[in-house]
Amino acid sequence: MEPIHNPPPQTCSYSRPSTTYTSFKDASCDTKVTRIIIALFLIVISCGLILCAYTFRDLLDADYLAQEGPQQATKLLQQLDDVLTGPPLPIWDNEHLFQFSCLMQNKHRRVLPIDICNPLTKFNFLECICNCLMTKQSVNVNETDMCELFCPPTCTPENYRRLLCTSSVFPFVMWHDPSADTQEAMLTKMDQTMSSGRVGNSHWVLVIVDIEYRCVTFFDSLCDYVASPQQMREQLEGLAVSLGAIYPKEGGADSDQEELLSPFQVRIGSTVKVQSPGEFTCGAWCCQFLAWYLENPDFDLEEKVPTNPSERRALLADFISTTEQAMSRYSSLSWPTTD
């Protein structure tokens, strides 16, 4: 009997596939193209996910964006552009406004300097303007005694009377802070701002009453910071009616009474923003507007002011630099004389 020989057990050997990694430089042309396509595909997918995330975030922030106002990105870009255009322009406050109005009085003679000791706000400016114009009317007809005449602390009653008699253009500046909702709150905010030495949310706007031209002109360098142009027009139309009664038109005995008492014209000097975001140049813009008005009351602001922010800034910077030295003669805040 022959022995049985069992065959040796068979073993399975698995060969591990060899993986060779090559650098992009050493890879074949087909491999390079494949890798580039994959990379671009991943970039596109990543960008899509990012955009989806931003869209979802915008939906979450919809209420916040509605409160803050539209075009936030545009405003941020404008502010960045303003920061990059150069050093900040000087801040012109009430003293600068007074000094410049004195300079204009010396040049044009028919301008009454701005009374900075009697602050105007949106709550009292209509009454204050009417009182000033009524005082001029009574002075013209010698109905006001020297003792009854209210005049600024840095001006004598005699000099103030002479200035009133010779003036026909009356510029008024109004101080505004949007956080104040009453006259008392506005004055308190004004004192706090002056004490802190910071501008905060404060803003200057200009009202020009021209008796000869029979016109009331309002200028806001931010266009709608105090109120919308239409709202300001409605308020000024009430003032225009009062001024028409104080200063009726000249006419003969047979002139129509209603025509003689016709209201002054109302002009909104700016329907676009000329003050760039992030700048505190409202005072300087008020002075520039007054200078242009005295040269030509019918001038068009949009024709004077460049649309490019850098050019607009350069224009105002040139105005400030050429005016500050001449204004310095009135640094004592004493009113100019008519002698």
From Swiss-Prot:
- Give the enzyme class: hydrolase
Extract one GO molecular function annotation from the record.
Answer: deNEDDylase activity
What are the annotated GO cellular component locations? extracellular region; host cell; membrane
Membrane association type:
Single-pass membrane protein
Q: What keywords are assigned to this protein?
A: Hydrolase, Membrane, Protease, Secreted, Thiol protease, Transmembrane, Transmembrane helix, Ubl conjugation pathway, Virulence
Q: Which Pfam families match?
A: Peptidase_C48 (PF02902)
Task: Give the highest taxon in the source lineage.
Answer: Bacteria
> Where is the protein found, in the record's own terms?
Secreted; Host cell; Membrane
Q: Which InterPro entries match?
A: Papain-like_cys_pep_sf, Peptidase_C48_C
Positions of the catalytic residues: 203, 220, 282
**Which residues are listed as membrane-spanning?**
36-56
EC number from the UniProt entry: 3.4.22.-
Q: Name one GO biological process term.
A: protein deneddylation
Role: Effector proteins function to alter host cell physiology and promote bacterial survival in host tissues. This protease possesses deubiquitinating and deneddylating activities.
Q: Which family does it belong to?
A: Belongs to the peptidase C48 family.
What name goes with this protein? Deubiquitinase and deneddylase Dub2
Write the lineage as a comma-separated list. Answer: Bacteria, Pseudomonadati, Chlamydiota, Chlamydiia, Chlamydiales
